[in-house]
């Protein structure tokens, strides 16, 4: 049921963005883009994340509405213009995937560093000794 709720939330957000954003931006320019962001993304975020159509577990990768909106946009063009649109978008999808992997690696490194610093603050150090000196002592098992 969780998958079905998420799929419904992604579909609603994707269809509304793909049908409303472009006309607003074309008719009202940059203001239309900001207006679309406000009147589409705000309520869709509320429905999907606050109400809970899209559930993100604490120990799982975070999947946001952008994935559903992106897939909806790609598939809309495939249905309207043919499979060539999917083929022409593959390089962009590949670069997005590479960027996502790199972002995940950087985020994991940052999270690991933050956890290490948090643990260091929790442990009591000897007066006059900095964290590096204490780590060196612990590695050499002198303590």
From Swiss-Prot:
Any one GO BP annotation for this protein: glycerol metabolic process
Cell compartments where the protein resides: Membrane
Domain of life of the source: Bacteria
Main subcellular location: membrane
Chain intervals for the UniProt region annotation (Disordered): 118-143
Spans traversing the lipid bilayer: 6-26, 27-47, 60-80, 90-110
Cross-referenced Pfam families: DUF6905
Membrane topology: Multi-pass membrane protein
Alphabetized UniProt keyword annotations: Glycerol metabolism, Membrane, Transmembrane, Transmembrane helix, Transport
Induction (record text): Repressed by GolR.
A GO cellular-component term linked to this record: membrane
Protein function: Could be involved in the glycerol uptake either via facilitated diffusion or active transport.
Protein name: Putative glycerol transporter Lin0368
Source organism (scientific name): Listeria innocua serovar 6a (strain ATCC BAA-680 / CLIP 11262)
């Amino acid at each position: 049921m969780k998958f079905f709720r998420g799929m419904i939330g992604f579909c609603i957000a994707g269809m509304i963005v793909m049908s409303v954003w472009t006309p607003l931006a074309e008719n009202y320019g940059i203001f239309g883009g900001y207006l679309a962001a406000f009147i589409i993304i705000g309520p869709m975020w509320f429905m999907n994340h606050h109400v809970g159509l899209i559930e993100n577990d604490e120990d799982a990768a975070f999947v946001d509405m952008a994935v559903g909106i992106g897939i909806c946009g790609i598939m809309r063009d495939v249905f309207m213009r043919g499979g060539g649109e999917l083929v022409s978008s593959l390089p962009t999808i590949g670069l997005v995937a590479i960027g996502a992997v790199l972002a995940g690696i950087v985020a994991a490194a940052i999270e690991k560093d933050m956890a290490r610093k948090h643990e260091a603050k929790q442990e009591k150090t000897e007066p006059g000794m900095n964290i590096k000196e204490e780590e060196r002592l612990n590695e050499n098992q002198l303590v």
